[in-house]
C-alpha cells in the first residue's frame, strides 16, 4: 500500500529521522495513477489546531484549501505539485534516480526545511508517523548528540536499524535494509553533515524548533467558507481575481489600523505594537505571496503582474486584495512558530491577529466580492499549462 499524498511521515536524511510531508508518490506497479499530485480534493489545512469542517452546498468538499501552503507552514512549489516525466518514460518522474524506477518512492518535504531539500526517497527511508517511530527518532537524535559531544562525525554512527528494534515501517509490499546502497546518499543532492560542536549546535537548535507549538488562530466559520469558495473559484472554475484590486491589502491594513488605534493613546506602547503588527502583516504578505499564497493556476498571472511596467514600482500588497490576504492566515501559525519570539510576544501577536481576522469577518461583504473573480481567457489557460 502506497502512503497517501499530503500525509505526514518520518523520513531518514543522513542517520537521523525528520518529520516530513509526502508531496508525491511513485508506484511502478501503478504507473500513471500515483505519480503526481492532482488538484482534486484539497488537503485539510489546520489553522493552528483548528481544522475546518465547513461543507459547501454545491459540492462534497469539506476541507480548507491549501493556498499553495502545507499545514505546517511550509511551501510546496511547482516542482512539488507538477509532475514532469523523464524523456521517453511518460510515467516516471524526471528527477527520480534511475536505480529507483522499479520501487515505490516518495517525494517528501522535510518540515521546517527549505524547498531546495525536497527529494525523492525510497520506501525504505520512510516510516509511519506513530509513537514507536517517534521514539526511534528521539533515540537517533540522542545517539547523534552523544557522538557529537565526543567529537565523532555523524557518519561514525551505527546504521539506524542497529539502534532500535521498534521501527514500524510504512505499509509497503516489500522492505529493504536501511544499510542498502539506496539509503541516505540517495537523491539529487549530497547529504550535508557537520561533525563535532557544529553538529551539536545544529541538533540543539532543531530540538528547540521542534518544541515550539503553532499558535491556534480563531477564524470565523464564514471566513473558512470564504476560503473554500476561493479555492473552488480558482482551481475548479478556472477563474482569476482581477488585478490590481480596487481595495488592496495596503488599503485594508490602513482601515484596520485606523479603527484599532482608536483604542490606544497616541504614542503609547500599545499603539507602537499595533503599528509593528500591521507592518509585519504587510511584510509577510509581500514576501510570501509568490512562494506560498498562489494556486498553480494563478502563477502565470503573477508573472504577468511582476513583469508589467505599470506595477514595477509597486509591492504585491499594493496590487492584491483580501482574497489572497486571507490565505496568509492559513500559513501564519507555522511561520510564527519558526521565529524566535518568546511566549509573551506570541500571545500579544495572537491577540492582534485575531482582532484583524474579526475585522475581515465584519467587513466581509465589502472586501470579498464574488464579482472580483472573472473567467480566464483560453489564451491564459494555454499559457498556464505551458502550451
Swiss-Prot record:
SUPFAM superfamilies: Chromo domain-like (SSF54160)
Keyword line: Chromatin regulator, DNA damage, DNA repair, Nucleus, Transcription, Transcription regulation
GO CC, alphabetical: NuA4 histone acetyltransferase complex; Rpd3S complex
Domain of life from the UniProt record: Eukaryota
Compartment(s) of residence: Nucleus
Annotated ranges, domain Tudor-knot: 100-126
Keyword Amino-acid biosynthesis (UniProt): no
Main location: nucleus
Keyword set includes Chaperone: no
Pfam families, sorted: MRG (PF05712), MSL3_chromo-like (PF22732)
Alphabetical list of PROSITE patterns matching this protein: MRG
Family annotation (SMART domains): CHROMO
Annotated stretches, region: Disordered: 52-96, 159-197
Residue ranges of every copy of the MRG domain listed in the record: 211-385
Family the entry assigns: Belongs to the MRG family.
UniProt function note: Involved in deacetylation of histones, chromatin assembly and chromosome segregation. May act as a transcriptional oscillator, directing histone deacetylases to specific chromosomal domains. Component of the NuA4 histone acetyltransferase complex which is involved in transcriptional activation of selected genes principally by acetylation of nucleosomal histone H4 and H2A. The NuA4 complex is also involved in DNA repair.
Name this protein carries in UniProt: Chromatin modification-related protein EAF3
Organism: Yarrowia lipolytica (strain CLIB 122 / E 150)
Lineage: Eukaryota, Fungi, Dikarya, Ascomycota, Saccharomycotina
Amino acid at each position: 500500500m502506497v502512503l497517501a499524498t499530503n500525509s505526514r511521515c518520518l523520513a531518514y536524511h543522513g542517520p537521523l529521522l525528520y518529520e516530513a510531508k509526502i508531496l508525491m508518490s511513485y508506484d511502478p506497479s501503478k504507473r500513471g495513477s500515483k505519480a503526481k499530485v492532482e488538484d482534486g480534493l484539497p488537503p485539510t489545512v489546520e489553522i493552528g489546531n483548528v481544522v475546518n469542517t465547513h461543507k459547501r452546498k454545491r459540492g462534497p468538499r469539506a476541507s480548507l484549501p491549501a493556498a499553495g501552503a502545507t499545514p505546517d507552514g511550509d511551501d510546496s512549489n511547482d516542482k512539488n505539485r507538477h509532475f514532469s516525466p523523464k524523456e521517453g518514460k511518460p510515467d516516471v518522474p524526471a528527477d527520480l534516480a534511475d536505480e529507483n524506477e522499479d520501487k515505490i518512492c516518495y517525494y517528501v518535504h522535510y518540515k521546517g526545511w527549505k524547498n531546495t531539500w525536497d527529494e525523492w526517497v525510497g520506501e525504505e527511508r520512510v516510516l509511519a508517523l506513530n509513537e514507536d517511530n517517534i521514539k526511534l527518532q528521539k533515540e537517533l537524535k540522542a545517539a547523534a548528540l552523544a557522538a557529537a559531544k565526543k567529537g565523532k562525525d555523524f557518519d561514525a554512527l551505527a546504521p539506524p536499524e542497529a539502534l532500535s528494534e521498534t521501527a514500524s515501517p510504512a505499509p509497503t509490499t516489500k522492505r529493504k535494509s536501511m544499510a542498502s546502497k539506496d539509503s541516505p546518499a540517495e537523491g539529487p543532492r549530497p547529504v550535508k553533515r557537520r561533525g563535532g560542536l557544529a553538529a551539536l549546535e545544529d541538533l540543539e537548535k532543531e530540538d528547540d524548533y521542534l518544541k515550539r507549538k503553532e499558535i491556534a488562530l480563531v477564524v470565523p466559520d464564514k471566513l473558512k467558507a470564504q476560503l473554500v469558495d476561493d479555492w473552488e473559484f480558482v482551481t475548479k472554475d478556472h477563474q482569476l481575481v482581477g488585478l490590481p484590486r480596487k481595495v488592496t491589502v495596503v488599503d485594508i491594513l490602513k482601515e484596520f489600523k485606523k479603527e484599532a488605534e482608536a483604542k490606544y493613546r497616541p504614542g503609547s506602547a500599545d499603539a507602537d505594537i499595533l503599528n509593528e503588527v500591521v507592518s509585519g502583516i504587510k511584510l509577510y504578505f509581500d514576501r510570501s505571496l509568490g512562494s506560498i499564497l498562489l494556486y498553480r493556476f494563478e502563477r502565470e498571472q503573477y508573472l504577468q503582474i511582476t513583469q508589467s511596467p505599470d506595477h514595477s514600482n509597486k509591492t504585491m500588497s499594493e496590487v492584491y486584495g483580501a482574497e489572497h490576504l486571507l490565505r496568509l492566515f492559513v500559513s501564519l501559525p507555522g511561520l510564527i512558530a519558526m521565529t524566535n519570539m518568546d511566549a509573551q510576544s506570541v500571545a500579544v501577536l495572537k491577540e492582534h491577529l485575531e482582532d484583524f481576522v474579526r475585522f475581515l469577518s465584519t467587513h466581509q461583504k465589502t472586501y470579498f466580492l464574488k464579482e472580483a473573480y472573472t473567467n480566464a481567457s483560453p489564451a491564459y489557460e494555454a499559457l498556464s499549462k505551458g502550451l
